[in-house]
Amino acid sequence: MARIFITGSTDGLGLAAARSLLNKGHEVVLHARSTERASALTDLSSQVAGVVVGDLRSATETHRIAEQVNAIGRMDAVIHNAGIYTQQSRGSTPEGHAGILAVNTLAPFMLTALMERPDRLVYLSSGLHRSGEGSLGDLDWTERPWNPARAYAESKLHVVALAFFLARRWPQVLSNAVDPGWARTRMGGASAPVDIHTGQLTQSWLAVSTEPAAMVTGRYWHHLRPELPAAEAMDLAFQDNMVIRLQELTGVVLPGGRRC
């Protein structure tokens, strides 16, 4: 059985994936943004391998999340599920970053770099990433007029590019991105066409399945099928330059080569 860490797993797709994996006998480590959210997981607290707490908007707390997970032990897989949707204003994290960038892009990058390397990485993206622009010179929206829909789309482009970059940087790790579809969650709303079980299937499958179809890397998935992502996400120069920029923004360096 595998041990899986899932960010943003107190509700929505993250919680659904956790329940699905627990029901299959796997060990799951949950993540809650606050102690209040963690305390609400009373029905799962005795079943999981751990619950880590920290707000991904904060770089300091993201470092602490990585420390908490590493203290539990190496994960077999990590599902980077946490994300926020459109915000009407740029906002400002404790480090001065745009909220969407911090949670959707910087946090998964930092956790990937700071946590002990797993065998599998799964990054939740969105079909909306195709409407994102690279804009590596202004990732943090300090120069452009704020556009919440564009900021979200860009953040989801970033994680696809990150997944593909890691497939090259760490060839022994299976690194993939997933579009779960517009699912009926607190974020997606009650009118969304995809039920929550279907929405969590692909990322859960990629995290643990030994089927040959799941033992691949550098792919973009939608409902158990590989799809073609935005051309920019597949551009090697864009991937490389994006990672350089993320390292500059966070002060965190992504390790290279084989697992230490």
Task: List PLM regions with ranges.
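C-terminal helical subdomain
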Residues: A177, P193-D240, I244, E248, ...
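N-terminal Rossmann NAD(P)H-binding glycine-rich loop of SDR-like oxidoreductase domains
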Residues: T10, A18-R19
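Rossmann-fold cofactor-recognition segment
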Residues: S45-T60
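Catalytic loop of short-chain dehydrogenase/reductase
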Residues: G83-I84, Q88-S89, A98, R120-Q172, ...
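Conserved glycine-rich Rossmann-like NAD(P)H-binding loop of the short-chain dehydrogenase/reductase
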Residues: K24-A40
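Conserved Rossmann-fold cofactor-binding substructure of NAD(P)-dependent oxidoreductases
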Residues: L56-R74
